């Protein structure tokens, strides 16, 4: 076939025109004849389609057709994308359809930058654990957000009755739309019979109307086959919460469990335990485990050492069984480290997250502080997807003024799939708190409380070297013991010389020059003076406890300084044998082996080494972290017999002793000295008594000069613990984090706070009342449809204003000297009280009992037989209404009575003063009442001259005179109103008043449940103005660059530090100087030593003060109440560790930097660790800004300070 093709080509005569056309399929050597190979190649090339046409061919082939333009398509409905879909709401295991709701359609490209849904794509691996400030937080609760969006308050603020937005972003108000009936209009929109399909031609689409859907739902049980077509293929059998089934009943989310009753069938309820325990569980533990197995959230409140950790451990085991994660949060980092060690022994896959440590961050059990979890939630960390349980330990720290807000934020922000486990000491309002958590998360919370202690306590007073029992193990206060202690205290002292202290003066002077000992010596008196005062007390007390076999003992001292002083009084006391000394030596050597040689020689380590070998120790915030951990480990092993500790030791892992001693019953709370609260006493005393070892625990209260009174002791020992009180407050970081996303408004966060719990709990009831009032108002308006009440309403408003001005006049008058004389004995008054009809009375002297909002006066009043209100009682008591008042009160059968009335109920103070027997009336003597009745015998109506108003001209008060003038104007206005003389005036006035009252009730309740009634809303608006003034947000409250930088700052003052970063103020300082300057953002302790700094650092210090003053001036201008937000650099010693941090960054040893200040070593370490966190946040801020030089600088600063003992790994790791 190919040869025939070649022959055909050879016969073709190629013309010039053809050569041009075939230019693309032949070469220059073509002479009119082709070989077989060439012909085959050219034919294949010619027949093979080219990927592109030549320009000449395109010009020849392109053609444009003219078409007629039509506008009919503009009248058609466009094909729109469905943004929502209708989902059925089901209930019960059978999935019974109970209703339907409209839900948004999912967007295909969901990611952490545009969606808060759990269906979004995961972010990068680097952001899995910590998240990013550019991420959107996961939605806290879909149903709750829907409920909030549907509240009347939100609709009034943003939406019209038809659900359409009316307030554009940035506008304070929207369009003023005329009121319409939502239901009627909505039904009209969905009524196909009312659609005019002739006017509009729409595309062929099948609509399912609401009416059709409702008909299907009505017949769901009888016509099951018809509904099958509408059912989705995958049926969900998830049970809906009760709130979706009964909209009129407010669900009770908190359920109190009776933990005193034993669970006989626990094995049947939980046949396969996720974690087996080697001991018999208590009832409250069984209850908690059962509810965890059922997927419920629990709130466990029990005494210290009662076994709450069992619940936490079981939740961790359950998470591992379900292949999910459990997060354990604690108030402080040290507690997280301790729990990490304990959990590591029981569970394999355990991790910990702190500011500077990240161990196994993808473990099934993660330990962290509550602040770290809050940061993860705001940053939308993907790790949250896998979390099944969050365990909040020491929940009673929600009462903490500074950090309590963190607990509330985390609970509010947690996703709905997370099960909550709340562990707390015993508090009186557990149900109230659980109810708030349940309402916020739409979860049932089971409250499991136990007042039973595993080891009962006995309480003693230590007086004159003797113990006097004042409370026995059954909780009974022993008055005989208290009297005996009091009698012993009153006996004269015998001079006693403490032989144990002859060499104690050498204690700390020989150890070191500055730091701990020097600081201790600088207090109020030297160590010697303290020893002379307290030596005998502690020597005899410890000797007595040793003889009575009551060691180990924890002595709670509410001062770091006195902890050191008291232990110095026991210099010659040795409580450990040789074997115990050897064990102590091994533990210490093993612990300090991780330190550099120079750090092992620190005076504090040497001092504690000697002290621990004798079985003595101290534990407070001034110790190095490694020293505190050594003390804790040795105490748990029973190698510390006497421990002087501050109250922070009472919080945390189980470290019980045989006895507990209180060095006093007062503490300084930062403002003044006060008695210990019952909760604080209970928390500390709970360390007494070792479960399984001691029959009872011993608690001793030290008494030196005088005993506390019995009432104080009873309250402290046996009184209820402090209630959980909300410490929720707004911070700039919280506001900016919520403004950058749209899923949760600040108003919603405030509504969900514990502080708004009472108000928000009443919202459903108020909504029901509003609905009821609206129905009554609608019926009333139909009844009044034929009556023109325009003039009546004008008269009514004037009457109500008259009443208000009268009340204001009386309240102002009674606060002045001349006005008070008017309210004298015998003065005639006209008054009404609540539902009591208008009547007359006589004041009995000037005996006035005043409270915050009203005054109470003694009167003799005319008591009618029928005291129900009459139509004329709705009118103000003004002369204009004299002809329409009901005068039935003056019937001769009515008698006078004695009583108390409120000042707010007085309608007129009359000019008449009667001579009465006040004492006889108070004593209810009949003669006194008869004489009074005789003086009123001739009075028949209110228009009598007897009721002429008193002359107020002697009252000299501006507000009184202002109200008096306005009331006179209204009096004249009412007198000239002809409507008063019409025949049906009272009837029409009563109808108008009823309408006015219903409308007022609706407005008041609507205002009560609206956002404008939120307690913290004014503070929010003021902080918004501050942020706008500083340029963190714009007029539409969109977060700007400054705001995004401030979102990175969590551990200190975000405003001041952001200003420094964006003004590039730190660029002129070296890394060491930057470290010194930033130390001012984390140091907040007292110091008497002024740091020595260079002129350049002094310039930087003045720069920080200048920026802080600028920020504070703006806050003061907008009246922002800032509490402990780190903005006060002037009045607080914020710059006390500048020299220390500067030299540390330059490489000076820790031993030498302690000589530069009187601040304790532990406080120095804590400051540098917090400084590292600030540097890390500054590095993140530099990344947001795009400043690579600053990013590198902050990284270098971190490397300079992260060394040696300051960043020594925890012994618990």
From Swiss-Prot:
One of its GO terms (cellular component) is Ski complex. Its main location: cytoplasm. GO terms for biological process: endoplasmic reticulum unfolded protein response; nuclear-transcribed mRNA catabolic process, 3'-5' exonucleolytic nonsense-mediated decay; nuclear-transcribed mRNA catabolic process, non-stop decay; polyuridylation-dependent mRNA catabolic process. It is found in: Cytoplasm. A motif (DEAH box) lies at residues 393-396. Its EC number is 3.6.4.-. It comes from the Eukaryota. Residues 494-514 are annotated as: Disordered. Residues 289-445 form the Helicase ATP-binding domain. Residues 545-736 form the Helicase C-terminal domain. SMART domains: DEXDc, DSHCT, HELICc. Pfam families: DEAD, DSHCT, Helicase_C, MTR4-like_stalk, MTR4_beta-barrel, Ski2_N. Keywords: ATP-binding, Cytoplasm, Helicase, Hydrolase, Nucleotide-binding, RNA-binding. Residues 494-503 have a biased composition (Basic and acidic residues). One of its GO terms (molecular function) is RNA helicase activity. Disulfide bonds: none annotated. ATP binds at residues 302-309. Component of the SKI complex. RNA helicase component of the SKI complex involved in 3'-mRNA degradation pathway. Belongs to the helicase family. SKI2 subfamily. This is Putative ATP-dependent RNA helicase C550.03c.
């Amino acid at each position: 076939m190919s040869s025939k093709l070649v022959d055909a080509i050879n016969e073709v005569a190629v013309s010039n025109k053809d050569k041009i056309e075939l230019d693309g399929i032949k070469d220059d050597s073509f002479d009119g004849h082709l070989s077989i190979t060439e012909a085959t190649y050219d034919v294949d090339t010619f027949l093979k389609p080219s990927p592109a046409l030549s320009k000449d061919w395109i010009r020849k082939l392109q053609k444009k057709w003219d078409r007629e333009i039509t506008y009919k398509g503009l009248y058609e409905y466009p094909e729109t994308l469905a943004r929502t879909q209708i989902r059925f709401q089901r209930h019960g295991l059978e999935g019974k359809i109970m209703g339907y709701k409209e839900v948004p359609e999912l967007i295909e490209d969901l990611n952490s930058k545009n969606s808060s849904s759990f269906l979004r794509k995961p972010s990068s691996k680097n952001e899995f654990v910590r998240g990013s400030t550019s991420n959107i937080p996961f939605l806290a609760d879909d149903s709750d957000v829907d409920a909030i969006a549907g509240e009347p308050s939100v609709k009034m603020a943003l939406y019209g009755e038809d659900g359409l937005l009316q307030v554009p972003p940035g506008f304070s108000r929207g369009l003023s739309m005329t009121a319409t009936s939502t239901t009627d209009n909505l039904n009209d929109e969905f009524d196909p019979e009312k659609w005019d399909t002739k006017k509009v031609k729409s595309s062929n689409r099948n609509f399912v109307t609401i009416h059709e859907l409702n008909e299907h739902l009505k017949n769901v049980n009888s016509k099951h086959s018809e509904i099958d077509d509408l059912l989705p293929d995958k049926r969900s059998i998830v049970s809906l919460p009760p709130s979706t089934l009964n909209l009129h009943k407010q669900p009770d989310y908190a359920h109190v469990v009776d933990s005193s009753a034993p669970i006989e069938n626990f094995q049947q309820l939980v046949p396969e335990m996720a974690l087996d325990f080697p001991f018999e569980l208590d009832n409250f533990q069984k209850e908690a485990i059962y509810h965890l197995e059922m997927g419920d959230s629990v709130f466990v409140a029990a005494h210290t050492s009662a076994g709450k950790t069992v619940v936490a451990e079981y939740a961790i085991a359950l998470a591992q069984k379900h292949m999910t994660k459990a997060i354990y949060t604690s108030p402080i980092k040290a507690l997280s480290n301790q729990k990490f060690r304990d959990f590591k022994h029981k569970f394999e896959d355990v991790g910990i997250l702190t500011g500077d440590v990240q161990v196994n961050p993808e473990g099934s059990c993660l330990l962290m502080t509550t602040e770290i979890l809050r940061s993860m939630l705001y940053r939308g960390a993907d790790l949250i997807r896998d979390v099944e349980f969050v365990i909040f330990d020491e929940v009673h720290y929600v009462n903490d003024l500074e950090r309590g807000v963190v607990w509330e934020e985390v609970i509010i922000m947690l996703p709905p799939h997370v099960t909550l486990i709340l562990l707390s000491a015993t508090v009186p309002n557990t149900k109230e708190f659980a109810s708030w958590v349940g309402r916020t998360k739409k979860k049932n919370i089971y409250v499991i409380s136990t007042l039973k202690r595993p080891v009962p306590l006995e309480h003693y007073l230590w007086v004159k070297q003797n113990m006097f029992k004042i409370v026995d193990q059954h909780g009974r206060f022993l008055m005989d013991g208290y009297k005996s202690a009091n009698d012993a205290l009153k006996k004269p002292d015998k001079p006693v010389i403490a032989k144990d202290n002859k060499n104690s003066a050498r204690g700390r002077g020989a150890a070191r020059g500055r730091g701990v000992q020097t600081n201790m010596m600088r207090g109020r008196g030297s160590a010697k003076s303290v020893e002379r005062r307290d030596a005998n007390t502690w020597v005899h007390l410890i000797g007595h406890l040793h003889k009575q076999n009551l060691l180990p003992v924890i002595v709670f001292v509410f001062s770091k300084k006195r902890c050191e002083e008291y232990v110095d009084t026991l210099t010659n006391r040795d409580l450990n044998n040789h074997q115990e000394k050897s064990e102590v030596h091994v533990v210490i050597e093993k612990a300090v082996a991780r330190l550099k040689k120079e750090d092992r020689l620190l005076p504090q380590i040497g001092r504690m080494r000697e002290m621990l070998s004798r079985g003595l120790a101290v534990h407070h915030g001034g110790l190095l972290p490694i020293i505190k951990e050594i003390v804790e480990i040795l105490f748990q092993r029973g190698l510390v017999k006497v421990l002087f500790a501050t109250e922070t030791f009472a919080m945390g892992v189980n470290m019980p002793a045989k006895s507990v001693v209180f060095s006093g019953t007062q503490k300084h709370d930062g403002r003044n000295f006060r008695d210990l609260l019952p909760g604080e006493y209970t928390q500390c005393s709970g360390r007494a008594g070792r479960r399984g070892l001691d029959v009872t625990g011993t608690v001793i209260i030290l008494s030196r000069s005088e005993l506390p009174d019995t009432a104080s002791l009873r309250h402290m020992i046996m009184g209820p613990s402090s209630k959980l009180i909300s410490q929720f407050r707004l911070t700039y970081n919280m506001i900016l984090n919520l403004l950058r996303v749209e899923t949760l408004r600040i108003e919603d966060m405030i509504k969900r706070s514990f502080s708004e719990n009472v108000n928000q709990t009443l919202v459903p009831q108020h909504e029901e009342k509003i609905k009821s009032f609206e129905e009554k108002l609608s019926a009333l308006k139909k009844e009044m449809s034929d009556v023109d009440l325009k003039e009546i309403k004008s008269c009514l408003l004037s009457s109500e204003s008259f009443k208000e001005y009268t009340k204001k006049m009386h309240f102002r008058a009674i606060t002045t000297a001349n006005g008070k004389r008017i309210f004298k004995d015998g003065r005639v008054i006209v008054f009404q009280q609540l539902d009591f009809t208008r009547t007359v009375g006589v004041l009995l002297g000037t005996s006035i009992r005043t409270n915050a909002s009203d005054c109470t006066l003694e009167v003799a009043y005319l008591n009618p037989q029928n005291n129900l209100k009459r139509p004329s009682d709705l009118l103000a008591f003004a002369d204009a209404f004299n002809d329409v008042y009901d005068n039935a009160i003056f019937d001769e059968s009515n008698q006078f009575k004695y009583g108390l009335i409120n000042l707010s109920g007085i309608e007129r103070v009359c000019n008449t003063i009667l001579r009465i027997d006040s004492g006889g009336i108070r004593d209810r003597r009949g003669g006194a009442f008869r004489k009074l009745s005789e003086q009123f015998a001739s009075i028949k109506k209110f228009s009598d001259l007897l009721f002429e108003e008193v002359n107020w001209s002697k009252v000299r008060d501006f507000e009184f005179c202002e109200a008096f003038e306005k009331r006179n104007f209204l009096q004249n206005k009412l007198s000239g109103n002809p409507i008063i003389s019409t025949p049906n005036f009272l009837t029409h006035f009563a109808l108008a008043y009823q309408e006015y009252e219903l409308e007022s009730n609706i407005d008041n309740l609507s205002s009560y449940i609206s956002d404008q009634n939120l307690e913290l809303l004014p503070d929010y608006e003021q902080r918004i103005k501050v942020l706008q003034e500083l340029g963190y947000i714009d007029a539409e409250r969109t977060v700007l660059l400054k705001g995004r930088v401030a979102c990175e700052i969590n551990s200190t003052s975000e405003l001041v530090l952001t200003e420094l970063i964006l003004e590039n103020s730190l660029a002129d300082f070296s890394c060491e100087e930057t470290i010194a300057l930033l130390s001012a953002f984390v140091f907040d302790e007292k110091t008497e030593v002024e740091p020595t700094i260079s002129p350049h650092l002094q310039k930087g210090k003045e720069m920080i003060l200048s920026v802080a003053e600028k920020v504070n001036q703006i806050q003061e201008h907008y009246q922002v109440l800032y509490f402990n937000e780190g903005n006060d650099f002037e009045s607080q010693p914020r710059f006390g560790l500048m020299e220390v941090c500067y030299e540390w960054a330059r490489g000076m040893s820790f031993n030498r930097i302690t000589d530069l200040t009187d601040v304790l070593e532990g406080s120095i370490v804590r400051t540098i660790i917090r400084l590292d966190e600030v540097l890390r946040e500054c590095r993140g801020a530099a990344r947001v800004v795009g400043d690579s030089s600053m990013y590198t600088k902050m990284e270098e600063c971190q490397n300079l300070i992260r060394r040696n003992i300051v960043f020594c790994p925890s012994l618990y790791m």
